[in-house]
């Protein structure tokens, strides 16, 4: 079907291809340009080609996106370097000065022993141990609540990095546990995201029904409902948890919001971790934090899914509109070309007709002038113009009379002819 359609209507979807109006045959048969506009343009590309174009990204597009990402990384690296490197240099200088001051004030401690102590402290911090105070007020990072929270960070792929397995058995079990737990959590996240999407969808439907009663356009309703959905989710999963973390952990408002966003986007730097401070927590605090992470990730997944659906719809509509625009553009181009050719043909015909009429008039006038000239200027009826100087006039013979015509400066044999003489004196 598509092949036959493309053979019948190549180029564009007009009913009849625009004829070449400068061609004598077509010009004779088509006195006017044949314009045709189809109400529903047909996209000539096959469905298989369009599907493959949608499903498979071209290398040119991939290369362009790759260059954009690299440029984005370079910009980010430049900004982070400008913001963070001066602070790093300042802290390094401060530590060196403090070490020198400590060694100067404590002669019994040499620099080698102090460096060994610092290395042990750094290793303890990397292991998740805060070497402050004595052993009586130290909180274990591997109690049941902390272990539950760590297992949750494994299967959610957040991986804060503040604690990690140190034994060989723990590392082996973590590998197997992650390979099995991550897909399982993916199914759970999808299910929770669908349920949240359904709940929010019902709420959005009620909001849309309310706006429909107020005669608000569908586009504005969709925009308003989307903004409400995003704002409600941000308040429930970002603002409210940030306030709770600020109060419990003793963080600033910026640090609390920073932790929430870094966690729910699964970045998980580990510089701020809920339940990681050296304070007394409730036993159910860390499990509750993990359930908040679960629901928050599901919300973000629902938002991303909704955005993806919108982008697909917009992309589909855009492709259809582009196809229709191309079809109309091709048809318009053909029609304009046909009209231009017809205009040029008409101008050529008019110019040719005027030229022919001018030529005919010229020939007619030339024929008439030639006839009058032959009739008037016969050998017996000539008009002679004789120019004389004053001195020459005196030398010339007197006028000869031939009937009523006088000759001046002519030979005598012309006296018998009817010749008109005009004397121009200089």
UniProtKB/Swiss-Prot annotation:
Residue segments, region Interaction with AKAP5: 313-326
Q: Which reaction does it catalyse?
A: K(+)(in) = K(+)(out); L-glutamate(out) = L-glutamate(in); chloride(in) = chloride(out); Rb(+)(in) = Rb(+)(out)
Region labeled Selectivity filter 1 — which residues? 157-162
Annotated residues that bind K(+) 2 are located at: 158-159, 267-268
The segments labelled Important for GNG4 binding and L-glutamate release in astrocytes in the record are 17-38, 51-61
Chain sites annotated for binding K(+) 3:
159-160, 268-269
Q: Where is this region: Selectivity filter 2?
A: 266-271
Q: For this UniProt record, give its keywords in alphabetical order, as a comma-separated list.
A: Cell membrane, Cell projection, Disulfide bond, Glycoprotein, Ion channel, Ion transport, Membrane, Metal-binding, Phosphoprotein, Postsynaptic cell membrane, Potassium, Potassium channel, Potassium transport, Synapse, Transmembrane, Transmembrane helix, Transport
Locate the compositionally biased regions of type Basic and acidic residues.
1-10
Q: Does the keyword Phosphoprotein apply?
A: yes
MF terms from GO for this chain are: identical protein binding; ligand-gated channel activity; mechanosensitive potassium channel activity; metal ion binding; outward rectifier potassium channel activity; potassium ion leak channel activity; protein heterodimerization activity; voltage-gated potassium channel activity
Q: How is its activity regulated?
A: Activated by various stimuli including intracellular acidic pH, mechanical stretch and polyunsaturated fatty acids such as arachidonic acid. Activated by volatile general anesthetics such as chloroform, diethyl ether, halothane and isoflurane. Activated by arylsulfonamide ML335 and thiophene-carboxamide ML402 compounds. Inhibited by extracellular acidification. Inhibited by antidepressant metabolite fluoxetine (Prozac). Inhibited by barium. Not sensitive to polycationic dye ruthenium red.
Describe, from its UniProt entry, the tissues in which this protein is expressed.
Answer: Detected in hippocampus astrocytes (at protein level). Detected in dorsal root ganglia (DRG) neurons (at protein level). High expression in brain and lung. Also detected in kidney, heart and skeletal muscle. Not detected in liver. In the brain, highest expression in olfactory bulb, hippocampus and cerebellum.
User: In the UniProt record, which residues carry a glycan?
Assistant: 110, 134
What compartments host this protein? Answer: Cell projection, Axon; Cell membrane, Sarcolemma
Give a GO biological-process term: chloride transmembrane transport
User: What does this protein's UniProt record list under function?
Assistant: K(+) channel that conducts voltage-dependent outward rectifying currents upon membrane depolarization. Voltage sensing is coupled to K(+) electrochemical gradient in an 'ion flux gating' mode where outward but not inward ion flow opens the gate. Converts to voltage-independent 'leak' conductance mode upon stimulation by various stimuli including mechanical membrane stretch, acidic pH, heat and lipids. Reversibly converts between a voltage-insensitive K(+) 'leak' channel and a voltage-dependent outward rectifying K(+) channel in a phosphorylation-dependent manner.
Q: Relate the assembly described in the record.
A: Homodimer; disulfide-linked. Heterodimer with KCNK1; disulfide-linked. Heterodimer with KCNK4. Heterodimer with KCNK10. Heterodimer with KCNK18. Interacts with AKAP5; the channel is recruited to postsynaptic microdomains by AKAP5 where it can integrate neurotransmitter receptor signals. Part of a complex composed of AKAP5 and ADRB2. Upon AKAP5 binding, the channel is no longer sensitive to intracellular acidification, membrane stretch or arachidonic acid stimuli. Interacts with POPDC1; the interaction enhances KCNK2 surface expression and is inhibited by cAMP.
Give the comment on domains: Each subunit contributes two pore-forming domains 1 and 2 which assemble to form a single pore with M2 and M4 transmembrane helices lining the central cavity and M1 and M3 facing the lipid bilayer. The transmembrane helices are bridged by the selectivity filters 1 and 2 carrying a signature sequence TxTTxGYGD that coordinate the permeant ions. Up to four ions can simultaneously occupy the selectivity filter and at least two elementary charges must translocate across the filter to convert it into the open conformation.
Protein name in UniProt: Potassium channel subfamily K member 2
Q: Which organism is it from?
A: Mus musculus (Mouse)
This protein's encoding gene:
Kcnk2
């Amino acid at each position: 079907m598509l092949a036959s359609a493309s053979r019948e209507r190549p180029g564009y979807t007009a009913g009849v291809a625009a004829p070449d109006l400068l061609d004598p045959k077509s010009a004779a048969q088509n006195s006017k340009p044949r314009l045709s506009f189809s109400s529903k343009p047909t996209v000539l590309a096959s469905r298989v080609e369009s599907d493959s174009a949608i499903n498979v990204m071209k290398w040119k597009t991939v290369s362009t996106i790759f260059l954009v990402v690299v440029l984005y990384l370079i910009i980010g690296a430049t900004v982070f370097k400008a913001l963070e490197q001066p602070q790093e240099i300042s802290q390094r200088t401060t530590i060196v000065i403090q070490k020198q001051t400590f060694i100067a004030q404590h002669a019994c401690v040499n620099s080698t022993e102090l460096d060994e102590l610092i290395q042990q402290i750094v290793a303890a911090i990397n292991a998740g141990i805060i070497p402050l105070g004595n052993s009586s007020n130290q909180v274990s990072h591997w109690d049941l609540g902390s272990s539950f929270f760590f297992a949750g960070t494994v299967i959610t792929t957040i991986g804060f990095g503040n604690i990690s397995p140190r034994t060989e058995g723990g590392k082996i079990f973590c590998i197997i546990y992650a390979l099995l737990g991550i897909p399982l959590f993916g199914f759970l996240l999808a299910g929770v995201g669908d349920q949240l999407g359904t709940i929010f969808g019902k709420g959005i439907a009620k909001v849309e029904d309310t706006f429909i009663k107020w005669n608000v356009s569908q586009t504005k309703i969709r925009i308003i409902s989307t903004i409400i959905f995003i704002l409600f989710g941000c308040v429930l999963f970002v603002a409210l948890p940030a306030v709770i973390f600020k109060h419990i952990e003793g963080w600033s408002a910026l640090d609390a919001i920073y932790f929430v966003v870094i966690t729910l986007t699964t970045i998980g730097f580990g510089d701020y971790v809920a339940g990681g401070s050296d304070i007394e927590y409730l036993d159910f605090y860390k499990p509750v934090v993990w359930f908040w992470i679960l629901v928050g990730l599901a919300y973000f997944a629902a938002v991303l899914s909704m955005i993806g659906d919108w982008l697909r719809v917009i992309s589909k509509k855009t492709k259809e509109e582009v196809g229709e625009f191309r079809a109309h553009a091709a048809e318009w181009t053909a029609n304009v070309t046909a009209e231009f050719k017809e205009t040029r043909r008409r101008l050529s015909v008019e110019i040719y007709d005027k030229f022919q009429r001018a030529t005919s008039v010229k020939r007619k006038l030339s024929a008439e002038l030639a006839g009058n000239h032959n009739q008037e200027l016969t050998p017996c009826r000539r008009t002679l113009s004789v120019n004389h100087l004053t001195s020459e006039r005196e030398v010339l013979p007197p006028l000869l009379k031939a009937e009523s015509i006088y000759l001046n400066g002519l030979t005598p044999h012309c006296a018998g002819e009817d010749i008109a003489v005009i004397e121009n004196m200089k």
